[in-house]
Amino acid sequence: MRLSSTTFVVLAAVLLASGTAVSKADETGVTNVNAVHSPNVLAGVDKRFLRSHHTEDGKAKLSNYDNEERNGLFAAGTLSDMANDMIFRFKMFTKWKANGHLPKAIKKDIPRSLYKAYKIHHRMN
């Protein structure tokens, strides 16, 4: 046998032997990773209460500010659209009244012109 053929056979045998050893090392590492658990998951503390407040009775309640923000009733874009579009303004005034917003309560949240218009709308309807 030639020297190059012998070298090739030896290198192939070494490569196969080292490949098997590496793959067994990977298998043992994977089983150890699965054994580690977070203490929060085991204790049942994995719930997150985003934008809400957890109360003693177990129900999450949003504050009035969060409810308004979610509905978009007093968002800057909404107020801008109301100033430019009378039909949209009337629809929003109807929603405000349906949600129980009194003119005096929202006076600081809206522009003066919308406050005056809402005050009239609230009295008429």
Swiss-Prot record:
Q: How are the domains described in the entry?
A: The RxLR-dEER motif acts to carry the protein into the host cell cytoplasm through binding to cell surface phosphatidylinositol-3-phosphate.
What are the entry keywords?
Answer: Secreted, Signal, Virulence
What is the role of this chain?
Effector that suppresses plant defense responses during the early stages of pathogen infection. Suppresses cell death induced by effectors and PAMPs in plant hosts. Triggers a hypersensitive response (HR) in the presence of Rps1d. Suppresses BAX-induced cell death and enhanced P.capsici infection in Nicotiana benthamiana. Also suppresses effector-triggered immunity induction by associating with Avr1b and Rps1b, suggesting a role in suppressing plant immunity.
Q: Which family does it belong to?
A: Belongs to the RxLR effector family.
The answer to whether the entry has keyword Protease is: no
The knockout outcome noted for this protein's gene is: Leads to the gain of virulence via impairing effector-triggered immunity (ETI) allowed by host resistance (R) protein Rps1d.
Keyword Nucleotide-binding, does the record have it? no
Signal peptide start-end: 1-25
UniProt superkingdom: Eukaryota
Major location category of this protein: secreted
Which gene is the coding source of this polypeptide chain? Avh6
Q: Which GO terms describe its cellular component?
A: extracellular region; host cell
UniProt induction comment: Expression is strongly up-regulated during the early stages of infection.
Q: What else is known?
A: Avh6 is present in P.sojae strains that are avirulent on Rps1d hosts, whereas the gene is deleted from the genome of virulent strains.
Q: Where in the cell does this protein reside?
A: Secreted; Host cell
- Residues forming the motif RxLR-dEER are 48-70
**Designated name of the protein:** RxLR effector protein Avh6
